[in-house]
Every structure is written in C-alpha cells, then in structure tokens.
Amino acid sequence: AQRIITVSPDVTVSTNLSGWVNQRGLFHVNGQTDMFTVEELQTMHRWRASPTGQHIELGIAENNLFLLLAAAGLSHSIFGERLLPVGTIYDPFIERGLDALNYACYQDARFLLVATPSGISLAPEGGAHQSIGTPLIGMSKPGLASFEPAFTDELSTIMSFAFSYLQHEKTEGEDTAIEADLLGDRCGGSVYLRLTTRRIEQFEREIDDTLMSEIIDGGYWLVPPQSSCSVVIAYIGAVAPQVIESCDELNHDSPGSTAVLAITSADRLHRGWMEAQRIRYRGLEKCSAQVEKLLGAIDSNVRIVTVTDGH
C-alpha cells in the first residue's frame, strides 16, 4: 500500500476516494496546515497535506491526469522503483485526455484507471456527461485491459488481478503467443475499470478458482444453459438487474429456455478469440479462447441477445 498513489481531476469525493485520503493524506512538497482542524470545524474530510501524502489532487485537467499516470507508471524504468498509480475520473471525460492516454499506453506505462460513474448512473446529469462510447475506447487500446464488472466480488477479483498485472514484465526473447497465455498476461499492462454508482443487489457466493479464472478471462455463465435453452442474454455491467429479472420471467413461462452470460470484459473475450485464431493458424488446432469455451455449451441455433450500458 505504500507504493500506491492516487490522483483525481477534481472528483476525489464523487469517485469515493475520501476514505483513502483520510487515511493516507494529500501529497504536497511542503506540509500544509489543515484549517478545519485548527478552527475545530466539523468535517468528514481530514485531508492532511504533507510530503508523505499518497493522493494528488488536480483541478479539472483530465489531460494532466493521464500525463501524471504515465509518468508515475514509468517510475520503475526511470528510477528503478515501481509505483502503483490509480487514477479516478468520470467515465465520459476519458475522451478529454485521449492523446495523453494513447502515449501512456504506447510507452507501456502501468496504472489502474477507474472510471465512475458511467452510463445510466451518470446520464441524469445530461449534456456532456453522456458515457456511451467509452467501452470501444477500452477495447481499442493495446496495453490497456478493460473490465466492466457488475458485482463487488467480481470487482475484488479483478482488482487483485490488476495489481499483479501492473507489475508483470516480458522476459527478453519470450514468445507471448502460446495457448496457455492467450491474453499475454505474463507481459502485463495497464487496467481500465468502467464502473457504476448504481445500487445493485449483491450475491452471496464463493469465488472458487474456476470462477476467478473466468471472471479475469472475460466472462462466465451466471445462469448456465439447460438442454432446452433457446435464448442467451449476454450482458455487461450495470444492466445486470434487468437481465436477471428478464431471465426469471422467461424461465417462469418456459422453464430452462433462457441462460445468462455475464461478461466482465468484452475486451479480453475479443482479444483472446483473436489470439486463438492466430495460434491455430500457426498449427495449434486444439487452442480455444474463453468465449469459444463458453459458447461451446450451447447449440448453434440458440439466439443470443446482447445488452450493454453503452454503444
């Protein structure tokens, strides 16, 4: 935790970093007096500024956010000491700093980008706060693995993976295109989490090794298909409650007719499928991607309905 630094462009409170800042403090080259403490004012925010603080507060400057994430994410190659930078931002405002994000990924900087709120949980603000196209941004960036979990146990699993993934390095001369590592996880990269502030009822379940692997690889069967399955609803992110409700209604009318495929990363499902095709082209015919394994459980005539909180 001493190597984690957080940074936010004017949205520290609204992206729920207040508790972290209370514990770890703001970074400032010189110590600053907390006037709330001096004046004995009541506040939930105890933000002490000092050279040992681990949160950097920016103004409304998303481009600066990505420049800072890039610089901090390259600390291991410049100074020989790795930092684990975490940046929080409103999801649609990623577009304000795309050029800096492109170059950060191009340089193989390592960081965790947390974008929240997004989609329907941000849409009521209207205007420029429309988070629609960002899933495509996440899929299109080499060196950036994007995830969009719906449940907290999925998020916990992904974050545990992410902090290791940020630190992985490719061994010189190592061939990354092997069946055991279709997604190139041994080489590492940065991670983008597209999250929501929507209240979603959580499951009480145990994440075993198999489910953990499926969550990280991009998807799993939330409601497994039965032999009578005729429809699959594949969803990602905050639309989970409506999908589960629809599945219950359809299966009530026609038992076993509907299955639900929970996608945690469309990016990694697609990337794994593309890499599997390349490997098969090279002669490894038995290689199969996660999405192929999942869809292999249903007949070819089953209809698939996809639902996403975006475009």
Language-model regions, residue ranges each:
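Thiamine diphosphate
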Residues: 16-137, 139, 146, 154-160, 244, 261, ...
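Active-site pocket-lining segments that scaffold enzyme catalytic pockets across diverse folds
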Residues: 1-14
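Beta-strand segments within the central parallel beta-sheet cores of soluble alpha/beta enzyme folds
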Residues: 5, 82-89, 150, 194, ...
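Short, flexible loop/turn elements at secondary-structure junctions
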Residues: 10-11, 60-64, 89, 197, ...
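Short acidic-aromatic active-site loops that bind/stabilize oxyanions
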Residues: 54-62, 148, 232-236
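Short, intrinsically disordered, charge-balanced linker/junction segments flanking boundaries
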Residues: 1, 62, 307-311
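Short coil/turn connectors at secondary-structure junctions
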Residues: 2-4, 50-53, 78-85, 107-111, ...
